[in-house]
Amino acid sequence: MLRHSISALALVALAIVAAPMSAQQPRALKVFISVDMEGLAGVVSGVEVSANGPDYGHFRAIMAGETNAAVEGAFRAGATEVLVRDSHGDKRNLLPADVDPRARLLRGASSGPKNMMEGIDSTFGAVVFIGYHAKAGTPGAILEHTSTGNVVDFTINGVSLPEGGYNALTAGLYGVPVVFAAGDRALVEQLRGLLGPIGAVAVKEEIGDASLGMSPKRAQDEIRAGVERAIRSRAKARVYKLSPPYTMVLKVKQERALYAGALKVRDGEVTFASPDLLAVLAAFNAMK
C-alpha cells in the first residue's frame, strides 16, 4: 500500500513539473506602425495635411482612423504589443486620445537619424506603413516627395529610395521586415518593386493631378484586413538590406551647408559614404 502511495505521489509530482513545460506560452510579437499623412484616403493637397490648413482636423481624424485599423489588424494577427510612430511633419498629428489604447504612441520630432522609424529595434517582428507616398519625381503619384520639397533624388549604393525605402533599410538593420503598406497606387507599386510582394492597400490613385480613391471607411476596412493577413504571413516577408559600405548621393534644388565628411559632386549634388547606415541617414537629414 505504501509503495502504491509513493508511486502515486511521484506521478503527481511529475505532472506538476511537466505541466509548465508542456504549456506553450504565446510568443511575443511586437509590431511597429509608422504613419504619414500624404498617402491617406482622400488627401490630394498639401494644405489638407498642414496644421494651419482649414481641413487639417478632418484629415487628422482620417489619420487616426487608418492608424487604428492597422492596430486592430495587428492585434487580430496575434500582436502582443504595438508601437505607433507619428511620422508626418513635426510628428505631432495623432492625438493620444484618438489612438487605440492598446497601442503605445511615439510622437514628436526626433533628433536621431531614424526619424520616421524612431523606436524600431530588434525586438520587433514586423513593420507596417500607413499613409505613405511615392518619392520625388514619381509619375502618376499624389503629393510625391522625398522627406522635403527640396530633395530631387536620394540614392544609397545606386538605389533611388522613397521614404518607405530608406525606412525599410532602417528596419532591416535590426532584421525586421516591412510586411504591409497603405498609400496611393504609385507608392504601392514603388515599394513592391523594392521590397517584393508585401501586403498593401492602394487607397487612391492619381488622375490628372486629382485623387480618385476609396471612402475612409472602406480604406480602413481594407487596411484592417490587409494588416492582419500580412502579419500572419510575415514569415514570407523579406528583410530589406543593402551591403555596406553605404554611399549616398543626394540631389537637391537648393544646397544646404555641407555635413562633415560630405563631398560636393557638382551644384545641387553631394555624396557621403560610411559603413554605418545610420551615419548616412544623419547626413541625409542634415542636408535634405
What residue spans do the PLM features occupy?
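Bacterial N-terminal signal peptides
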Residues: 7-18
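C-terminal accessory domains and tails appended to enzymatic cores
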Residues: 82, 219-288
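Mature N-terminal segment immediately following signal peptide/propeptide cleavage
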Residues: 25-46
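Active-site glycine-rich loop that binds ribose-phosphate moieties when present
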Residues: 148-174, 183-186
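Sec/Tat signal peptide C-region and signal peptidase I cleavage site
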Residues: 19-23
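Active-site rim beta-loop-alpha module in soluble metabolic enzymes
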Residues: 170-178, 182-228
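A glycine-rich helix N-cap at a beta->alpha junction
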Residues: 100-120
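Short catalytic helix/loop segments, enriched in acidic residues and glycine
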Residues: 49-69
